[in-house]
Regions:
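Bacterial N-terminal signal peptides
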Residues: 9-18
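Sec/Tat signal peptide C-region and signal peptidase I cleavage site
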Residues: 19-25
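Secondary-structure end/capping motifs
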Residues: 224-296
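Short, glycine-/small- and polar/acidic-enriched structural segments
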Residues: 25-155, 166, 182, 188, ...
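Conserved C-terminal helix/tail region of periplasmic/extracytoplasmic solute-binding proteins
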Residues: 291-310
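Sec-exported extracytoplasmic/periplasmic mature domains
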Residues: 47, 74-75, 93, 153-157, ...
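Pocket-lining segment of extracytoplasmic ligand-binding domains
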Residues: 86, 164-165, 170-255
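Bacterial N-terminal signal peptides that target proteins for export
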Residues: 1-9
């Protein structure tokens, strides 16, 4: 049967409407993350279509620090966020109703991404040499202070005899060269940028554990209970992303360069994190334990209690 122009127009309109509705059918989630290697999986998942594969329309906003992402998620301004596990453990310990839903960057002995450094001309060679010295960290009472403390104490030094100073990572190499500080914990990409002027004297993170989670994706317990399907889809997307990212370093470097202030040359040269392909309590517990040991949180607790369980 031949259709007239009007009938064809109606069919076209219906098809157009159906396609538009189909295109709008993906549920949306709002993610907040940081422009850093350890938290870059959201960028990779968006770029490679892993969120769409999981049936999600994901919008991503970049925040200045982990505290800002925790504030955004806990206030309801965002659905899911990325932050460092140390800050998340502190927030959880203080009663903020958050839950970890997927792992991100791992600290491992095989791929160290932050080292204890001194100026290249410094006489400091060992942890013992740091007694009476000044040590720069980006934040006091954080993993970047406690890991060096543990490293000093485990290697014949006394961390109580070391003065820790707060300083932005970007200023540390200059401060070392000017002898304003004696040592620093310098992570990537700052480590690669400063390699001509600094010398490593140790890897502090293994003093916490052979392997532990640097960062994780999280949400509130309220959002998790209200949106179990969206949560499953997000976790599925990240679980697809992690092994892909671990295998495709050149592609991840290019994606991260587009979403951060780290230039492609530095990304190509620097040490990169490995991404956790599962979320297990045993890679979270060391962070909680070190915080309790150095009295940054008032009591130790089981990592399992802050990991989402259906």
């Amino acid at each position: 049967m031949q259709r007239g122009p009007f009938a064809l127009a109606v069919v076209a309109c219906v098809l157009s409407s159906t396609l538009a509705s189909s295109a709008q059918a993906l549920p949306s989630i709002h993610i907040v993350t940081l422009p850093v290697d350890s938290g870059a999986e959201a960028f990779y998942a968006a770029d490679q279509g892993f969120f769409k594969n999981a049936g999600l329309d994901a919008s991503i906003d970049v925040m200045p620090n982990g505290g800002a992402t925790i504030a955004a998620v806990s206030s309801g301004a965002a659905d899911i966020g990325f932050s460092n596990v140390f800050s998340l453990a502190q927030a959880f310990n203080h009663g903020v109703p958050i839950t970890l839903i997927a792992g991100a960057g791992l600290a491992t002995q095989t791929s160290p991404t932050a080292l204890v450094v001194v100026d290249a001309s410094s006489p400091v060679r060992t942890a013992k040499d740091l007694s009476g010295k000044t040590f720069a960290v980006d934040a006091l009472k954080s993993i970047t202070e406690l890991a060096p403390r543990a490293w000093i104490d485990k290697n014949g030094g006394d961390s109580s005899a070391v003065k820790f100073l707060e300083m932005p990572f970007g200023e540390m190499a200059v401060a070392l060269a000017q002898h304003r500080v004696d040592a620093a914990l310098l992570p990537e990409p700052f480590l690669t940028r400063a390699q001509a002027t600094v010398r490593s004297i140790g890897d502090a993170y293994p003093a916490v554990a052979k392997q532990f989670l640097i960062g994780a994706f999280f949400t509130t317990t309220t959002w998790a209970k209200a949106h179990p399907d969206l949560l499953k889809r997000f976790v599925a997307a990240i679980h697809e992303t992690a092994p892909w990212a671990n295998r495709n370093r050149a592609q991840t470097a290019a994606i991260l360069a587009k979403n951060s202030k780290i230039d492609a040359a530095t990304l190509g040269a620097m040490r990169r994190v490995m991404y956790a392909e599962t979320l297990a309590p045993d890679v979270v517990q060391p962070v909680i334990d070190i915080a309790a040991k150095y009295h940054v949180i008032d009591s130790d607790f089981a990592a399992k209690s802050m990991i989402y369980a259906e």
